[in-house]
Design a protein with these regions (language model features):
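A glycine-rich phosphate-binding loop feature that marks nucleotide/adenosyl-phosphate handling sites
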Residues: 36-41, 151-153, 190-193, 225-233, ...
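Conserved, mostly hydrophobic/aromatic
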Residues: 42, 91, 250, 296, ...
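Short glycine/threonine-rich loop-to-helix capping motif typified by GTGT followed
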Residues: 199-203, 235-245, 272-284, 312-321, ...
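Mobile "lid/hinge" segments at catalytic clefts and subdomain interfaces of large enzymes
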Residues: 184-212, 295-299, 304-338, 342, ...
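Predominant activation on well-ordered alpha-helical scaffold segments within soluble catalytic domains
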Residues: 23, 85, 107, 136, ...
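Catalytic alpha/beta active-site cores
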Residues: 1-231, 235, 304, 435-453
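Glycine-rich anion/phosphate-binding loop at the beta-strand->alpha-helix junction
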Residues: 208-211, 229-321
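Catalytic-core signal marking the mid-to-C-terminal active-site face
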Residues: 319, 323, 329-454
């Protein structure tokens, strides 16, 4: 008995035919006004998509097998090592360490951690080539699994200053690239832009312009591998598309510079949409964001604990965050499907629209001197501030909803007595070379007013 393809019994339906049918169902209402909406990125989202929307392009971006990351701020290397080993036993697969000073002993921190199988991402709050040299000497046989995330441009953007100064920072960068044999040397912290209020097009364009500063610097030598740290927010399908667009844009830069330098994506949930009140909703938000990161093609996903903005690190919050990822991986099987977003017309369409718009903005940044020049003239800061203000107005007018904070509020909810960390923007009076890009949550003003009334 031969198998019959049931789809042969149905003729293809064109876009024109779909729109005609929808117009009938709308009974006179305007199609564009009723069903088409525009994203903050200027992308018009239609009520349906088909092959005609992706006829001219195919993404063709491979999705890696993603890993579960565990973030650890290292204040004491012995305690942090114990925490890391325990996290690995409980389901973590990669480790993400923030190193505050050069007094931290890396051999103690990484004791009993198998670097042949486990990726380690470092974020250094200082810049010292001698420190990197010690790590390379200790772990030269497994250096391919160490990501150093050296990001002097990102430090300038977020703090307003170089680690040392322009010349010395670049000298240290060159030394580190030589020491690490241009392995996973460079980091590009895109999270700063997202958490400060940049649109997705801006995030992608700034990521490319940011990376291009390093590519230009190393163009006459071997270009190191890059790690992009990307924050993922609640616009589910757009966030999937954003990560896919990032890989497309990186391929364009690879072609331009004739390099095979890798692009690793470390995805983390955004802090911008997280809230103090009705804080359990943060778990729902981060689950959606981690799922988007998985489908979008992140290499490592490091979840954010539901109480991270107001509680110190604690075992309960971190266990829940890790278990969210374990459920997505072990119970939902999101790690066994190759390129799960392939063939989704909507995602394919917005992937390419985001990439095209970001490429256009990237070119305009390069035409006006590049990323550093635009940081120094404060054009980047100005554009992010404008986008953040527009989003804030949407939140204030309840057009952008954060459940439990600006809509469906539980007035009996109290949080003041639970605050262990200061959850709002802190400003330190100090001299800076440029205006720093400041991260700020949408709910801060509302929460400050509610705290006064408790």
């Amino acid at each position: 008995m031969s198998k019959k393809n049931l789809f042969n019994d149905f003729s293809a339906v064109s876009t024109k035919e779909w729109k005609q049918k929808i117009q009938v169902d709308l009974k006179g209402a305007d199609y564009n006004d009723t069903l088409v909406w525009e994203s903050p990125e200027g992308i018009k989202v239609k009520p349906f998509y088909n092959t005609e929307d992706i006829a001219s392009f195919v993404t063709n971006v491979a999705t890696p097998e993603w890993k579960i990351g565990q973030a650890i701020f290292v204040q004491n290397e012995v305690a942090s090592n114990k925490k890391a080993v325990d996290a690995l036993k409980r389901g973590a697969e990669d480790l993400v360490f923030t190193i505050p000073t050069d007094t931290i002993k890396i051999d103690v921190l990484l004791k009993n951690i198998n670097l042949k199988d486990i990726k380690v991402y470092f974020y250094f709050q200082f810049l010292a080539s001698e420190y990197i040299a010690k790590i390379e000497e200790l772990y030269k046989d497994n250096a391919t699994n160490i990501h150093y995330n050296i990001d002097i441009v990102g430090n300038l953007a977020s703090s307003g200053n170089w680690f040392h100064n322009l010349t010395k920072d670049h000298q240290e960068l060159d030394k580190i690239a030589t020491i690490t044999n241009t392995q996973n040397t460079i980091g590009v912290n895109v999270s700063t832009y997202q958490n400060a209020g940049a649109t997705m097009v801006q995030q992608l364009a700034y990521a490319m312009a940011h990376a291009n500063e390093y590519l230009n610097h190393f163009k006459d030598t071997t270009i190191p591998n890059f790690t992009f740290t990307v924050s993922v927010s609640g616009n589910y399908f757009f966030e999937i598309a954003k990560l896919r667009a990032l890989r497309l844009l990186w391929k364009s830069l690879q072609t331009e510079y004739n390099t095979t330098a890798n692009c690793t994506i470390l995805a983390v949930p955004s802090k911008r949409n997280k809230t103090l009140y009705d804080y359990n909703v943060n778990m729902l938000r981060t689950t959606t964001e981690c799922m988007a990161a998985s489908i979008g093609g992140a290499d490592t996903i490091c979840n954010l604990a539901y109480d991270a903005i107001y509680h110190k690190d604690n075992e309960f919050g971190e266990r829940i965050a890790r278990n969210q990822l374990l459920i997505l991986k072990k119970e939902s099987y999101l790690d066994v499907v190759t390129n799960p977003a392939d063939g989704a017309y909507y995602i394919e369409s917005i992937t390419h629209q985001l990439a095209e718009k970001a490429l256009e903005l990237f070119k305009s940044i390069e035409a006006t001197g590049g990323f550093l020049s635009n940081l120094k003239s404060h054009q980047i800061q100005k554009k992010i501030k404008e986008s953040a203000a527009k989003e804030q107005e949407l939140f204030n007018s309840e057009k952008e909803v954060l459940v439990g904070t600006n809509k469906y509020i539980n007035k009996e909810d109290k949080i003041k007595e639970d605050l262990e960390l200061y959850p709002f923007v802190k400003t330190n009076a100090r001299k800076t070379l440029i205006i720093p890009i400041i991260e700020k949550r949408l709910a801060e003003t509302v929460e400050q007013n509610r705290l006064k009334d408790e």
